[in-house]
Structure formats: C-alpha cells, structure tokens
C-alpha cells in the first residue's frame, strides 16, 4: 500500500518505516516531491468522477457535490471569520479539517498512483511510492530518479495538479538527505 494517511492502521510512523525499508532494500534514489496547495487545487469534476466510480448511491454523490460547492468559513490573519465560496467559484479545492476531506484527498491521490502503475513505472523504474496526505516520495533503483521525476510531473499535470518546483528535488541516499 502506498498511502499512509487517514486509513485504518495507517500513520506517519508507518510511512517513515516504509521509506526506510525501501531505502535499505535497493531504492536509494528518491524523488522528494511537493505539490502546490494540494487540498486547495483538487479539481471538482475529476474528483467527482473518482467518487462516482466507487459510489452506487447517486444521493451520496449528490451530497458530496453539494458539500464541495458550499461556502466555507475561514479565519483571516487578523482573526476575523469570513465565509468564502472560492472552491465553488474555481471548481477546485476541498476544505481541510472537514470529516470527509481526508477520504477525498486519498481518493484523488490514488489517481496518480494508479496512473503510475498503469504505465508500468513501478516495474520499469523499480520504484515505490509512499504518500502521507499531500507529502509524496518516490523511491527508485539507482539512476532512475530523474526519469521518475519526469513521469511524476507528467502524471500530476494530467490530473491537473501542480508540482511545487521550488520544493521538489531528487536526492541520492546516503549522500543526500531528505525530510518526509
């Protein structure tokens, strides 16, 4: 399993253990990736398609659609509370802190993971993806991280997510270090 956030028995410690095991078992090249405003940029139309594939009851799908479009109360830097419809207006983003947000964020990240596997990149690059919420690393066989970075960018673009290039990098362990 690649996703370690929000699932039963999953947590940050298990993600770190998996990363260490992959490093130890021949995956020393790492793509340490950061997505720009992941929760705030998940496109509603594509997310609803993912939900629809897994939902038999159309009423549930309708409720999730309505929830994505409702206004959200936010606190500004001065501590004032305001209501915003930015997600509805932009047709993207899920509010953090809502009970259903973790499920939806994992579901959308799954699109990337399935795309990676469908292209056979897990086998071709000898790679293993480990995610925790919006944190993402791809552990590869030596010499494969640059290609993994290329494909990660390509797949993220195809699912309408933006890679934060300032925070995304290739790291070769043990020479380099990364935080997960």
Located regions from the model:
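Active-site and adjacent loop segments of nucleotide-processing enzymes
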Residues: 180
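Conserved polymerase palm-domain catalytic core
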Residues: 2-177
């Amino acid at each position: 399993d690649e996703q370690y956030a929000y699932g039963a028995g999953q947590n940050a410690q298990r993600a770190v253990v998996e990363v260490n095991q992959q490093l130890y078992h021949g995956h020393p090249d790492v793509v340490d990736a950061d997505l720009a405003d992941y929760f705030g940029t998940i496109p509603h139309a594509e997310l609803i398609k993912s939900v629809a594939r897994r939902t038999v009851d159309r009423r549930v799908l309708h409720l999730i659609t309505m929830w994505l479009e409702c206004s959200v109360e936010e606190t500004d830097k001065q501590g004032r509370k305001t209501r915003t419809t930015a997600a509805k207006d932009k047709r993207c983003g899920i509010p953090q802190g809502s009970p259903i947000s973790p499920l939806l964020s994992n579901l959308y990240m799954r699109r990337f993971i399935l795309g990676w596997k469908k292209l056979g990149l897990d086998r071709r690059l000898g790679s293993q993806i480990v995610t925790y919420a919006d944190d993402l690393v791809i552990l590869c066989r030596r010499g494969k991280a640059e290609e993994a970075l290329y494909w990660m960018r390509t797949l993220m673009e195809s699912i309408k997510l933006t890679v934060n290039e300032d925070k995304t990098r290739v790291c070769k362990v043990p020479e380099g270090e990364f935080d997960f």
